[in-house]
Amino acid sequence: MDVRLRRALLLAASLALLLTLLFAVPAAAQQEPKISQARATEIAKLDPKAVAATEQHPNLTPSASRNSSTGLWEVGFFTGDNEVVQVVVDPNTGKVVESWTGYQVAWRMARGYPGAFGRMINAPYIWLPLCAIFVLGLLDWRRPFRLAHLDLLVVVAGFGLSQYFFNRGNIGVSVPLAYPPLLYLAARALWLGFRRRGGIGLRPSLPITVLAVATVLLVGGRIALNVADSNVIDVGYSGVIGADRIADQKPIYGNFPDDDQSGDTYGPAAYYAYVPFEQAFPWSGTWDDLPAAHAASIFFDLATIAGLFLLGRRLRRGRRGTELGILLAFAWAACPYTAFALESNTNDALVSLTLVVALLCLTSPISRGIAL
């Protein structure tokens, strides 16, 4: 690695460190409602979806409670333990803000709430530039009509179309739209893996120094965004709970709290991976900011990036290996969907890290045994 590249990386690392000093602004305190619980229930009964459900299930039982985060009245209509309809009422105006039926009652993530996954990463002024950096950074301007460039577009545009409808709560459209890009990428991976002749791979037109600096800045930005404005979905929450159970020598399965009853669906390895982070940032017992989940996701992400860099150096010797490692690290750091997983604080990068470690260990029998 030459002197210019080292200086550029040092400057980029300094800028990235400044970005990580961002912090989140605390939410405002919840005010007393002007609309009473009984009044909110009566308003909810007049909602068209509640009326239609009552016609089908005459014995529906309403139950109202305030959401601790938003302060809104959530009026559920139950038949037994099954919530058929949920109507959300503004506690100050009495206006019906939302009403849900079907799977969108139980699964809030399917409602299309802004930022439900990753919060600010979904903002167009962040998401679109990140997509542009990913595509333009890996583009070979000298040969624009390569199939590899179509791969890049499928990642950002193919999945992006599905995500557009998902973010708006239109799951019936979003899910079918996810299949074409998945099938395309699966077919491409099989073709690349089984063809006899090796390809030339991606040959970005940008200098490797630019990609190296961009990688460091992107990593710093991803971490800063995670610290400042990211949320922990049920996946990360489950990991922290499982780690807490293991550390306390309690059963994992069938022993999860009411707000994450189905969180014990993973294998024990997923929970063990969270143990060091839960010990460093002990679980409070509630679904709060969960710093252990943030720390785990950041570690999985950074370890994957480092592993990809080492993998590039393993695949090729000398300077070419370093350049390939930087290219692989840049591709991960610039990909909007790896950032999407990080800002949702999932365990997705743990799977990627496992695959990268497996590839690194393939050339050594001892390493393969340790990895297993």
What are these regions (language model features)?
Residues 91-124:
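Short, aromatic-rich amphipathic segments at membrane interfaces
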Residues 1-15:
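Bacterial N-terminal signal peptides that target proteins for export
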Residues 138-372:
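Multi-pass membrane glycosyltransferase architecture that uses lipid-linked
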Residues 51-92:
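Exposed beta-strand-loop-beta-strand "reactive/processing" segments of non-cytosolic proteins
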Residues 12-24:
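Bacterial N-terminal signal peptides
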Residues 113-144:
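Hydrophobic alpha-helical segments
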Residues 27-29:
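Boundary at the C-terminal end of the N-terminal hydrophobic targeting segment
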Residues 31-67, 118-127:
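Short, non-transmembrane alpha-helical segments in secretory-pathway proteins
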